[in-house]
Amino acid sequence: MFSKKPHGDVKKSTQKVLDTKKDALTRLKHLRIVIENAESIDLKQFFDQHFSHIYYVFFENFVTIEASLKQKGHKSQREELDAILFIFEKILQLLPERIHQRWQFHSIGLILKKLLHTGNSLKIRREGVRLFLLWLQALQDNCSKEQLWMFSCLIPGFSAPQSEYGPRTLDNLINPPLSLQETQVTIEEVTPLVPPQSGDKGQEDLTSYFLEALLKYIVIQVKSLEWKNKENQERGFSFLFSHFKKFYLPYIFPNICKENSLYHPVLDIPQIRPKPHYVMIKKDAETNETIYCTKEPFIQARVIVIRWLVSFWLEPKPHSGPNIPGMEGEVLPKNIQRAAASLVSREESKNDTVDKVDKSAEPEQSHSNTSTLTEREPSSSSLCSIDEEHLTDIEIVRRVFSSKRSNVNFVTEIFRQAFLLPICEAAAMRKVVKVYQEWIQQEEKPLFMQEPEDTAITCSDIPCSETVADHDSAIEDGEKREEENGTSTSEHVRNSSWTKNGSYQEAFHVCEEATEQNIQAGTQAVLQVFIINSSNIFLLEPANEIKNLLDEHTDMCKRILNIYRYMVVQVSMDKKTWEQMLLVLLRVTESVLKMSSQAFLQFQGKKSMTLAGRLAGPLFQTLIVAWIKANLNVYISRELWDDLLSVLSSLTYWEELATEWSLTMETLTKVLARNLYSLDLSDLPLDKLSEQKQKKHKGKGVGHEFQKVSVDKSFSRGWSRDQPGQAPMRQRSATTTGSPGTEKARSIVRQKTVDIDDAQILPRSTRVRHFSQSEDTGNEVFGALHEEQPLPRSSSTSDILEPFTVERAKVNKEDTSPKLPPLNSETGGNSANVPDLMDEFIAERLRSGNASTMTRRGSSPGSLEIPKDLPDILNKQNQMRPVDDPGVPSEWTSPASAGSSDLMSSDSHSDSFSAFQCEGRKFDNFGFGTDIGIPSSADVDLGSGHHQSTEEQEVASLTTLHLDSETSSLNQQAFSAEVATVTGSESASPVHSALGSRSQTPSPSTLSRAHIEQKDLQLDEKLHHSVLQTPDDLEISEFPSECCSVMAGGTLTGWHADVATVMWRRMLGILGDVNAIMDPEIHAQVFDYLCELWQNLAKIRDNLGISADNLTSPSPPVLIPPLRILTPWLFKATMLTDKYKQGKLHAYKLICNTMKRRQDVSPNRDFLTHFYNIMHCGLLHIDQDIVNTIIKHCSPQFFSLGLPGATMLIMDFIIAAGRVASSAFLNAPRVEAQVLLGSLVCFPNLYCELPALHPNIPDIAVSQFTDVKELIIKTVLSSARDEPSGPARCVALCSLGIWICEELVHESHHPQIKEALNVICVSLKFTNKTVAHVACNMLHMLVHYVPRLQIHQPQSPLKIIQILIATITHLLPSTEASSYEMDKRLVVSLLLCLLDWIMALPLKTLLQPVHATGAENDKTEKSVLNCIYKVLHGCVYGAQSFSNPKYFPISLSDLASVDYDPFMHLESLKEPEPLHSPDSERSSKLQPVTEVKTQMQQGLISIAARTVITHLVNHLGHYPMSGGPAMLTSQVCENHDNHYSESTELSPELFESPNIQFFVLNNTTLVSCIQIRSEESMPGGGLAAGLVSANSNVRIIVRDLSGKYSWDSAILYGPPIVSGLPEPTSFILSMSDQEKPEEPPTSNECLEDIAVKDGLSLQLRRFRETVPTWSTIREEEDVLDELLQYLGTTSPECLQRTGISLNVPAPQPLCISEKQENDVINAILKQYTEEKEFVEKHFNDLNMKASEQDEPTPQKPQSAFYYCRLLLSILGMNSWDKRRSFHLLKKNEKLLRELRNLDSRQCRETHKIAVFYVAEGQEDKYSILTNIGGSQAYEDFVAGLGWEVNLTNHCGFMGGLQKNRSTGLTTPYFATSTVEVIFHVSTRMPSDSDDSLTKKLRHLGNDEVHIVWSEHTRDYRRGIIPTEFGDVLIVIYPMKNHMFSIQIMKKPEVPFFGPLFDGAIVNGKVLPIMVRSTAINASRALKSLIPLYQNFYEERARYLQTIVQHHLEPTTFEDFAAQVFSPAPYHHFPADADH
């Protein structure tokens, strides 16, 4: 206006101004100089003194300029006008007191009228408005009505005010229409000064233009009036403001409500408002975005007033310069600061218009001076960009607003009006939301938010560059909140402006008495009003069809929800506020989401196109979490809960609700586990035990450790199904699989990996953790990264920061209670004053992933808008997104699509890291930063004792927990610092402190809270987990002195046992009846989640009462989870229509899982009735899927539980299992069906008449069934023939085997036993070798029942042997050609099975002839034994030998009969056959061994057959001998009884002995011949049995494939008294230690000989068994005949034809006819006659008589080897033809070593098996190992396993046990001629010392098969006895009905074995044999996995082969004869002379 020139002498100019002689223009010029150069104080004084001069100068010049303007109107005149108006303004400003007294009233009024004339240009009119407002400010109450009318007309567009003269407009006020007489004086007409010029820019909306000007000038001119009394400045503003309210507000806000008061708020929830009519007005030039508006009157004015009012609360505080990027901390010139401010302002404005700001640029923008004011609308020149010079004006304005209640109410009401705007005005709403956000989040509250009793004194002179708050605490909310003490650069500081100077405070204290002046309403009132008012945004009907507006609406709603969430988590609220919050959330949820089914279907699949679809997830989440949080803090009434129930149950068609509910329940279950059961679900005792075991035994520690750390980081998600280090897609655990419906929903989350930040930024190369995942990332580790660096991230991150975070978690685990910083306006939900861990937990969930830079940036809801077109951008970037994606960050996606119970994004691992935080305590000496110490859950104590009360016990009813729902509410209060100080020791409860408290050292952060920036608007999906968590240091109660929780009517807030229980129960039912859910998919999803929920409850139950140290068993838990609580829903679900099939299947599954567990509390009668009804209907259901589900999930334990009345379902189960077995689908539960059937085979003999539900009638009808057995066996037989699944076929065969044994034991003579045997026998040649092997095992087991078979099925044993022979004959050719070891192993098994059967039958039976049906032409009869040797011959020498009819044993067709069909059709399997070689985990880790295997394979069958042959030759008819079954082979060695050897073992001195020689026979057998002294002194004569014999005996020791045998032989001369001629000499060969075979023990009674019933009397038989002599022969008897009969009886091996005595004539030879036979007889008779005649004729001839000979004198042999040589000669060993097969052995030490080694090898298969006894309540190894006895049933069982042997003298297999009694005195032992089993029985072994316990554990633990007899009510766990072995566990559980349930646990690589299977139920009579057989088969299966494993006979054969190869001595005949004649130089026995 004026160019400033240096005028030194202001005084001169002053004088010239006052010089009246000067002309007006000169005086004006000097006046300007004075104004420009004088100090303001002097200027005020000058004007006061010379006001009339000054006004005169001004007025004169104004008149002049006015005249010249009218004439010329050039630009120069306009500039002069500006200059003179400058003087006018100075007059108004400097002389307010005079103007107030109406000085120059009319003159000034006239000038202003000229300026305000509507004909002027807009610039002049606007200037006029400004000056008019100055004048009015000075006049205040002294103005006239005319001025007020003018004020009311300043803004065009408003209705004219009414007066007595009619409506007043600005025109008629400036030029009043006076009806005067012509003669009267008239006023000069006021005309425009400067009319609009042609180039002037017009304004479209004059109303807005002038309204903005008016509002602006009202404020910025407040302080420009130089009042002597400064209070008048405030009064001036108040005057203008009050009239503005009076004249304009009623039009701008027609529905303004004056009753609304912050002090008596009206808290009625508003109604839904209909959608306004939106009109498109234009398209944005830059973004091409359509802009909409509504045609409501004054809508723009409303927006302007709101924005104007908001600006006072969002203005930057004093001295806070604009943030210029890169210039932080520097002092800049003001002009640069201003430029920067406007630049940033423009930049932001542009960004806002184009789109919402790029997140990475946010830090600069959000700190700038104008950032909060210029949004969306282009910032017009002046309105909101008020610079810092005017901040003082703003302070005054703010003071006025805060001066009295009416003004505070005005602000509140205008903000309410903002929430009522249409959504096209969202920008204004955002500002109001921002204001509320700051009010709520900042520490320093506005005065009216302070509590009424607060003094609110705050320091007013803190320099702004200092810390935000240096330990000065503002008292707020009745709590002391400690300020954070981090420093920060000045541009980040927001100092409070409403408590800045002392006078301001004092002013309030002065007026405090008056109610109007007492404006402190308290935080709660503001929160309540905000909650109510902000709900209007939700309650506006959305414009779903207009995408831009929908985006805006969504954004606004999310901003509000973010604040709600912040309040829920961080703000302390009273009961009323909580109730208000809940009511509003309820109403909002209901209003937004409730829609008709038609409307809902219309948007199905297009949810993102509607507001409801976009908000469903966040709304449900916020509502549920707020509800839980409220219950933790205050008592919530029953009515409110009922409302919640009615609302949520009416919204179940939202999938998001189901998912949110499931997440809530999942976390609540963790809370319940922690608070009620003291378990951490992510760190369960059983998991720990198995992990320790894995680390200890398997060497997998390192990898596992890492996994564990990764998982354990998050308590809330500790059992997430994958490790965070992997890809972001989470996998579901094997234990829980989702239904198709939910898997689809869950899979969506996998695609939602684009987050809000990375859409516009960089390609996603690196991925950074969301800050919600780990609260401590902004620490020194990452501090070096530049703050603005943009880093994209994904919402399902599995981030690069993970390892660091884990480390930080470890470091900070002690820092459980740092004070979190308060959130200022930019601070987000990331870090906040977290009242306790639960809040932190919610906060965690409220915010998933809000940081996009690696420095610690917070994320406050609201400091940033989401770009409106974000969905489009996202869709462009990620075409794979699902169609229903709302296009907002994944945290906003519907929970159903953003993760569910099964599929978690990886951030779920850390989503509740902070779950262990509690409220910041008051630590005086520490300043806390923003990083939060996060202990990993592995470090959390479990110290939370049981809160046990009667109401928490489970009772036997449908509802298992009784808690009064009236008193149920959960609470976890935001603990104040004071409270926290009281309990700061962390010994919150006695229980907890006893477990050890935790250090509380805080870890200060390197970043202050000022760095925490809002990055985006995410509502965290993890909200739940935060709400629901329990801190480890606020475990039970923070107030030990107080008694009960808020919920129970007490004062304790937070989680407690009762709270967790009631909350869990209520939330479980909050969806109402889940069966009322209409959408089948959602219904299925809910039931799928119920299955998972139940699994967690079951997991809790399984982990209760677990011994931690494995040394003591804890007592049974007092509280147990209510596992049956879900059954009413499940029962009802089964009755739904087929539309809900998936849900029904889940329900059936869960019913079965629930009821097949051991029931802690027995179900009551009503329950069981209902349950059985449902099972009855389900098992007979027409839908096979339902049947399959029940069978799958009931098997195998259903019948083993002994539920009362469970047998009522037997018929149903048999029918259903039969249906499954006969169905064509391979994926049906076939194995389960067979297991169920197999578990029933022993039942019919127990229940002869079984009452059961009738399966053919759907109604309930009980019938008595006697044909259950037939039905079961029919089904099992059918399955054993036709079952297409291999494993199921194996189980069916095992069931058949068990059933046959059961029937034999019960002597039922069941006709189908033969058919069952037929099926088993036919299965021997089945193509699948696993099945054939199982069949072979069944036959093997039946060997133990041979005696019973012989009685009840006398033909069967022989038939089985014949079938085995024929089957081997049938299989051998193909097996020899096969390259698969499995094929060969099968034939070997069949050979060994055949051997056992042969040994089990008496010789008579084996010698019976085979009646072949197929060979009529073959008249020769072969005995069974003959066929056996033929088939063995074929196996040794190859199947080609069968081509010779002489060597062919028997064919299958020969065996066909009525009882046996050898070619019965068996259906082949429909699944791939398993690999022939059972390569397991063990065998697969081998070095290449294929060549060795091939050699072994080739000889497998041959060597097995040779073993069988030698075994039969040695033992058939002999075993067991007098030494008992434990003695199979001789213990005698060459040094025993040898007078030439004094050594106790084989030693080289034997080679010097002349009485011993070593031979090899047939290259397979080692023979030692020793000559020893006879035993004359023995009673009965010893070996010679009293007969005359030589003085030396011969001992032959034979070592062959089947063992070592010793035979002693003596030469017999005759009876003791010789009468007549001497008897011819003969040799008797007998066994060394016994005279004749003795009967075996009773267990081998099958070996007893059965007498031949040939009609002879007993006497006659006895007679036959004595040697016939002349004295005993009667006259009519023939001596030779009797002798032949005697020989046949006593030595049956001498019989030429089996069973036919030697004295019976041979049958007629085939080649001789009857005539020829008669001729021969006649010839013989003729010769007899001739001889008789000759004797009679020549009897007395002398030459026919001979003299009597004397007996020769015996000669004593001189050779020590004489008798051996003699015996060898008699046996023909010295003959030429034997020369090739009889050789000498080299005598050397190696031979002795080899012999000793050979003798140490086992000659039978050996097994050692552990047996444990577990008594009731025993859960640890110590209790189990110290049992010294068991129940009677157990002892009977152990007795049945074998017979008790005395270990001190036991000569059989010892299995490592000691003879010195250190491992016990006796133990059960079982043996046959082929197998030895010793049982390591824990109760038989001493446990009286630690050493004996260790020894006991070593013996038992090293066994690979464990038999466990458990009488405990809980299932036995594998890890109780810690061992690396124990690969197979056979657990026996006695049942109430005296049957026994079998559980088999085996490692996965172990192949199938029988006869018992997992789930079998057997009778006590067959139990011991079954278990023993199963254990032996399990042991064999385990050995089959050992690489290069050799059977005992293979090993022995190899040793023999080695000895023969290396030690056979080839010799000439002469050398051989010499060595046989004299093995060594002869020398005398020491005592030889006596002989």
UniProtKB/Swiss-Prot annotation:
It comes from Mus musculus. It comes from the Eukaryota. Expressed during embryogenesis. Expressed in the adult brain, particularly in neurons of the cortex and hippocampus. The modification Phosphothreonine is found at residues 753, 777, 1001. This is Ral GTPase-activating protein subunit alpha-1. Residues 343-384, 477-496, 714-752, 807-834, 848-911, 986-1011 are annotated as: Disordered. The gene is Ralgapa1. Residues 345-365, 807-817 have a biased composition (Basic and acidic residues). GO terms for cellular component: cytoplasm; nucleus.
